[in-house]
A protein has these predicted regions:
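Conserved glycine-rich "GG(E/T)P / GGGxP" loop and the immediately following alpha-helix
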Residues: 1-128
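Active-site-proximal segments of metal-dependent phosphoesterases and phosphodiesterases across multiple
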Residues: 129-134
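Accessory C-terminal segments flanking Radical SAM cores
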Residues: 135-225
């Protein structure tokens, strides 16, 4: 995503009164550090709450972690760092601990995103704000491809609802580098580089949308029917 695109996204977001926060996610946003830093700065200057989701690969030592985050102090409100056995060889990685130490020194709020292993059926899947500790796996994206075989299968007819996002009154959307505005990853409501955010939101009707309408009526199973 280019700076020009980021500026356009922020301009449109500023015109929508319900958008209060901007988060940079991935992939891994720290791989594009100069653009990430400028994007956070621009969002902060416009009055948005700012956040980043990262795997923390950059926090190899306490000293290095401090330098990576130093320029983000005072413009970054929070950072979420993934730490579990999908990302590292230990549940709470050295990188995550280094990032936490640096964030604390710089006054940046930091929390961990930790996903349980497939065989752990005691972990609840997080809806919206993730709970403390480990969350269960959402079988979407790569998880559906790589991990679904690790658990007992269920009949497709049993998937009769989508419990993870509010499709009628979404509290968040995801915008990809191509401008697609996703209500849930993979379900695009439109392209903001072609149609402004305000117009997309005004025209969106969850019941009549060709995908969300079916999901509301009967979940993923309804799409199959």
């Amino acid at each position: 995503m280019t700076l020009k695109q980021i500026r356009e996204i922020l301009r449109q977001a500023q015109e929508h009164p319900s958008i209060k926060s901007i988060y940079f996610e991935g992939g891994e946003p720290f791989l594009y550090y100069p653009i990430l830093l400028k994007g956070i700065q621009l969002a902060s200057e416009l009055g948005f709450e700012t956040g980043i989701v990262s795997n923390g690969y950059w926090a190899t030592t306490k000293e290095d972690a401090l330098e990576w985050l130093r320029s983000l102090a005072k413009i970054l409100d929070s950072i979420s760092v993934s730490s579990d056995l999908f990302h590292y060889s230990e549940e709470l990685s050295r990188q995550a601990q280094n990032a936490q130490n640096a964030a604390r020194k710089l006054g940046i709020s930091l929390d961990f995103i930790s996903i349980a292993q497939p065989e752990d059926d005691s972990a609840e899947v997080g809806i919206g704000q993730l709970p403390e500790g480990f969350s269960g796996i959402k079988y979407q994206g790569r998880a559906a491809d790589k991990l679904a075989d690790c658990v007992e299968g269920q009949a497709w007819q049993s998937f009769t609802e989508c419990p993870y996002e509010d499709l009628r009154e979404p509290g968040r959307v995801h915008i990809d580098p191509f401008g697609h505005m996703h209500i849930c990853q993979g379900i695009s409501l439109g392209n903001i580089f072609e149609t402004p955010i305000n117009e997309i939101c005004t025209e969106y009707n969850a019941k009549t949308h060709p995908i969300t309408g079916m999901l509301l009526k009967g979940g993923p199973a309804k799409l199959v029917e």
